[in-house]
Amino acid sequence: MTDKTSLSYKDAGVDIDAGNALVDRIKGVVKKTRRPEVMGGLGGFGALCALPQKYREPVLVSGTDGVGTKLRLAMDLKRHDTIGIDLVAMCVNDLVVQGAEPLFFLDYYATGKLDVDTAASVINGIAEGCLQSGCALVGGETAEMPGMYHGDDYDVAGFCVGVVEKSEIIDGSKVADGDVLVALASSGPHSNGYSLVRKILEVSGADPQTTELDGKPLADHLLAPTRIYVKPVLELIEKLEVHAIAHLTGGGFWENIPRVLPDNTQAVIDEASWQWPAVFNWLQQAGNVSRHEMYRTFNCGVGMVIALPAAEADNAVALLNSLGETAWKIGAIKASDAQERVVIA
């Protein structure tokens, strides 16, 4: 009988020991995110979570997202520490606009070859995002898939579940003529428009690490983590009447604000009410991007738009600013049957 070389999973490119080492590295930070409703620890086949007892008619709200090609930029610049915050932000910000409190979060991390340091850095960021949003990181999947990804390249996806009282769901149905729109400032491009960002970098020849903008490298502006609005927005909802909230993600102003507008209403945005942060001016100029395309692709300094009764607007701005946000009145709702749902003037 001919001797054959004994093959192992590691020979095929999957290092189970590296996966176990990663779990050991992240246990501590994951534990910090725990909520009282979570039952059991990491490592079960499924994560168990009870519903908070304060809800009379709890409705679960779920969401999933990624960070798009911002990830490519982070990999190229070898900066993995905040991409996990982006991942959580993209999910929990989508939940809170419906009035939901995030409960738990799971992540999926896929790579061709598992680099424990890189993966731990990403998951530390995920845990930080969960802490910022009061959400428990209850589990995840780390998939090492040789032949599927080039080298140390990786991709991430997030999944979040939240809860809202049925009678307090925010769905935009109460939006009315005369409502005031309040903006929450973004921290940068957040996690949208990065294919255009990368194209602008390519065409302009700008090196994000050596190009200075407002006293710091362009890379710092581009990789600034997506702002998580959960805690201040939940406090706003608790204290004041809120009719609708739009999270400005892919599609920018033109596509996200109409998602929360009832028929026969139009959002009128006052362009003079704020100044674009420097990074958006740089992107527009370096890429010769039209104003319409900027508002369609990027948040242009506005992370969320909140519609509420005019009588609540000043109180809302004051409350949000007291909670550490930068908030201002950005426009109003008017009755209109025009096809154009958003006007920026």
Swiss-Prot record:
InterPro entries: PurM-like_C_dom, PurM-like_C_sf, PurM-like_N, PurM-like_N_sf, PurM_cligase. Its EC number is 6.3.3.1. Pathway: Purine metabolism; IMP biosynthesis via de novo pathway; 5-amino-1-(5-phospho-D-ribosyl)imidazole from N(2)-formyl-N(1)-(5-phospho-D-ribosyl)glycinamide: step 2/2. SUPFAM superfamilies: PurM C-terminal domain-like (SSF56042), PurM N-terminal domain-like (SSF55326). GO terms for biological process: 'de novo' IMP biosynthetic process; adenine biosynthetic process. Keywords: ATP-binding, Cytoplasm, Ligase, Nucleotide-binding, Purine biosynthesis. It is found in: Cytoplasm. Belongs to the AIR synthase family. This is Phosphoribosylformylglycinamidine cyclo-ligase. It comes from Cronobacter sakazakii (strain ATCC BAA-894) (Enterobacter sakazakii).
